[in-house]
Structures are given as C-alpha cells and as structure tokens.
Amino acid sequence: MSAEEVRAVMSAPGNDRLVWNTPLSEEHAARLIAACDPAPGARIADLGSGWGELLMRLVESAPGATGDGVETDPDAVARGRKLAGERGLADRVRFHPTPAAEWTEDGYDLAVSIGSSHAWPGATARESTLNALTALAAAVRPGGRVLFGEGIWQREPTPAALEGIGAEPGDFGSLLELIRLAESVGLRALQVTVADEREWDLFESEGPIGRGQRWALANPDHPLHAEVTAEIDARRTGYYGGYRSSFTLAYLVLSS
C-alpha cells in the first residue's frame, strides 16, 4: 500500500470534524475576523485557502464582500465549493485551483495566508516565509490588511521537537523575528496572537491523529490498518514527545 493511500485516510479535506486546517478556536477566529475588519464590499483573497472556512466567515462578516480562495488541493476545492453553495455564497466566494505563488491579482482590501508559506519557493523555509509576506503585501491596496499565519518557536527547539515537526534548525524563528520580517516588507502588526496548547491539542486530536485512530478502530481488518496505525504512532511521538509546548502558529493581522 502506498503512502498516498495512508495520507488519503488521514487527509484534512475529508475530515468533517475539522472546521479549518489549523489550530484555531472559534473565539480566536472571531477575534481575528474582528481585527481584519473587512468593510462592506471588501475584496478578500486567501492564498492557500484549503476549503475556505475562514475566507467564507470573513466574507459573511461584511455585506457585499467577495472572496477568492486560491488552492491546489482538489478535495479541498470541492469541499469549499460545496460549503459555499450550501451557505448561499457561491456568487461571492470563488475557488481557483492555482498555486498561491502564481496568483497575480492585486488591489485586495485583505489578503490571507495561514500556514501556507511553503507555497512560495525559497532556498530555505525562512526565505519562503519572506517571499510569502512580500506577495501578500503586493496583493493588497495601500492601507489594506494582511492576515498571516506562520509557525514559530516559543523556546529553543530540542532535537525531538525538530524531528517531530520535520524542520531544520533555521526553518522557523521567534515571534519577534516574524514580526520584524513582516516589517521588512512594509507590513506593520495591528494584532498578534498565537495558538495556545488547548487549540493545538484539539487540532491534533480532531486532525490526522484523531481521524486516523477513529478510522483504525472502525476498520481493524483493512489492509491499510497496520500502516495507518504506524503513522498515528509516529505523529503522536512527534507531537506529544516533540514539539508540543515549544512550536506554535502565530496569527499576525498586519496593515500595509
């Protein structure tokens, strides 16, 4: 059995327990939306949108606002289009199966990218983050806003933490380093928050680890059972024995 089949079992777009593919509570999301404060008729882009739940909520928060979800995962795009249709947003939220780094529309009032900096090629992960911030700054009008989500270390990573997240020592910096990186491309922070431990625990439990475990319990005789269980165990070791409490996701609401 292939690694692709195991990933399909544990995939985020097929997991209806995940509201969004990021460690984010409802209360935290509401604060991000309030800080972004899209005006009526705002144009919003989400680069690397997944199925676009956050994009749709931003659009719903502002009468007449429209959104472009830019996403290459066909399963995520299909889920997003279905959700938009069910919520009466099909004419206001559109999904584009285009790589985020190739999206060239600009003049947006708000540009969003959560955990997708890897979509912008760079010689290092840090360079990809800089390239993502540069692209987001270019996508918004003067005075527009950017919502950027990126991984940071809250303390010096251990070898187990690096292995668990699959990172090299220089891939992620501190929260202050991320803020300074945004400033280097002309983006100033209006609000800075990070995912807390409870958000991460719930995300991991509802996400690939939990989805995989629920599937394994329901399918004990499936040919993929042993491989899925091994993947669950590896992810548990990586999170609980590695990056839990040291790595997190920062959410920066920025102004151009």
Whereabouts are the PLM-identified features?
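A short glycine-rich, Lys/Arg-flanked "PGG" loop and its adjoining helix->strand segment in the class I
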Residues: 127-145
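Short, glycine-/aromatic-enriched active-site segment of Class I SAM-dependent methyltransferases
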Residues: 148-169
